[in-house]
Amino acid sequence: MKEIIYIFIGGGMGSVTRYLTQIAVNERLSPALFPFPWGTFAVNIIGSLLIGFFYSFSERFNLSFELRLFLTVGFCGGFTTFSTLANDSLSLLKGGFYGIFTFYVFISILLGLLAVLAGGYLGEQFK
């Protein structure tokens, strides 16, 4: 039960942070640029970097299981959003933005994987 509480708190914090980040990114980029889900893209790439970092860092410093759950399953799980990526992609398709759709899906997956690798590398650099 203790693990569920850590995940619950981390997830809530991650969700609120995602919401605020998406608003900030969308206010700065979306009106001026072509129809691209910048906020969702940003949180998913940042979240991928963070989860790579948290996993690597927690292994390196032997963080408690509960703290690992809080950071990865909770915070990163709440911060990132695959469902919104899928919904944004569908909106691009329905809007006839086929090129942007293809680019968005491809670059989200590619940069997400690269961000996890980069985060893992950064986590290993701490001494």
From Swiss-Prot:
Q: Which UniProt keywords apply?
A: Cell inner membrane, Cell membrane, Ion channel, Ion transport, Membrane, Metal-binding, Sodium, Transmembrane, Transmembrane helix, Transport
Q: Say if the entry is tagged with keyword Ion transport.
A: yes
Localization, UniProt = Cell inner membrane
Coiled-coil annotation reads none
Catalysed reaction(s)? fluoride(in) = fluoride(out)
Q: How is this protein's activity kept under control?
A: Na(+) is not transported, but it plays an essential structural role and its presence is essential for fluoride channel function.
Biological process annotations from GO: cellular detoxification of fluoride
The annotated topology with respect to the bilayer is: Multi-pass membrane protein
Family matches, as InterPro entries: FluC
Work out whether the entry's keyword set contains Ion transport: yes
GO CC term, one of those recorded = plasma membrane
Give start-end of the signal peptide: none
Q: Which superkingdom is the protein from?
A: Bacteria
Q: Which residues bind Na(+)?
A: G77, T80
Q: Which GO terms describe its molecular function?
A: fluoride channel activity; metal ion binding
The portions of this protein that span the membrane are 4-24, 34-54, 65-85, 97-117
Role of this protein? Fluoride-specific ion channel. Important for reducing fluoride concentration in the cell, thus reducing its toxicity.
Its family remark reads: Belongs to the fluoride channel Fluc/FEX (TC 1.A.43) family.
- The name this protein carries in UniProt is Fluoride-specific ion channel FluC
Lineage from the top down? Bacteria, Pseudomonadati, Bacteroidota, Bacteroidia, Bacteroidales
